[in-house]
Amino acid sequence: MNPALQLGIIFAMAIAHSGAQGTVTKSSDHQREVALALEQQGKYAEAETAWRADLKAHPSRPEPYAHLGLLEAQQEHYKEAVPLYRKALALNPNVPALRLNLGLALFKGGELKGALHEFAILLKSAAPDSPEAQRLTILTGMAHYGLTDYAEAVPLLKQAAARDQQNLPLRLALAHSCLWSKQLQCVLDVYHEILTLNSESAEADMLAGEALDEMKDSAGATKMFRAAVQANPKEPNVHFGLGYLLWTQKIYPEAAKEFQAELANDPDHAQSMLYLADANLQMNQPEVALPLLQKVVKLDPSQSLAHLDLGIIYSDSGKNDDAMRELTLAAKLKPDEVNVHWRLGRLYRTLGKKDEAKVEFDKASSLNKAVDEDLLKKMGNTHPRAAETKVPQADPTNP
């Protein structure tokens, strides 16, 4: 699944949902009053029983379906709420706030394409520049964000941010969308807006650093990540980001310290463990690197660099079978990595397998050495969150 839903990326919009102030057609029967009272008391099971009894007595009325959907949504049973809201809409598509509550249930349940459809209908009828239009613009932008349609999210979140000059979470979401859609100047522009709201935002410094790294400004990126570390040394990934930049510049001793600092914050941070091991290997400390690499491949066996480094260590210590296993795995995971084929060629030559060695050396010579993976791609696998926000709740007065 996509980054925004799959990994716990939490959607957040600091927006209060007031909802429309209309009501569904109400009957004055006793059963309905009982159901409403139980619902207001938070007695969900009893309220559901009462609303189902009301539904049985009045099967053509949308109100029982709407309230049953609301009860499910209040218990975070969003997928169960959706068909109930849809049934209510089928009976009366003009019930105030009902379509919005359906859209919110779809959004929170991860059915973002369905949510977009409902938000689009609502946006058409919302008054321009109204609070409702602002709310729907944000929700639409965040739905695109969740679908990884970052380029689609940018203009919507930019429009919403222009209408809310003090909304920091909204600007962080916008900055992430700009970054992941490669609109790098947009990231820097939003970064300066964020600084006016919070001059000590480590996350904003990191975003600016990632953008500068994409723009090949290593010095500027490093400066931004140093500022982020100073602003909040506990910010997830902040030490890894700085360490990785230093590692790309071959400043291995300082890079190792940053990877160690990230591991102090998160002991299972596989990327920091991997690059700490590689930094130690680059500093001729294979005995320090080996246990780290062995742990990395247990945590994440898809890391080609870990297998390459293990292959180097085993090869240098004469453990040729182990070296062959690791280098072969590295070649399968990253077949266009020159160093893997060069190391395999050396190992085959050591084993007296001249033909196999020639094949690997030929592969190495025909490949252009891959450029080091950039910081954005590295951090895309480990970034714990995007902008944190709250999704508006379903309107209990207008289910």
Model-predicted segments: where are they?
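Canonical tetratricopeptide repeat
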Residues: 33, 67, 101, 135-139, ...
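Structural marker of alpha-solenoid helical repeat scaffolds
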Residues: 57, 91, 125-129, 163, ...
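Helix-start (N-cap) detector for alpha-helical repeat units in TPR-like alpha-solenoids
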Residues: 28, 62-63, 96-97, 130-134, ...
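Alpha-helical segment of the N-proximal tetratricopeptide repeat
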Residues: 27-60, 70, 74, 142, ...
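Terminal, low-structured helical/coil segments at or just beyond the last alpha-helical repeat
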Residues: 25-29, 342-399
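Structural signature of tandem alpha-helical TPR/SEL1-like repeats
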Residues: 40-53, 74-87, 109-121, 146-159, ...
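Bacterial N-terminal signal peptides
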Residues: 6-16
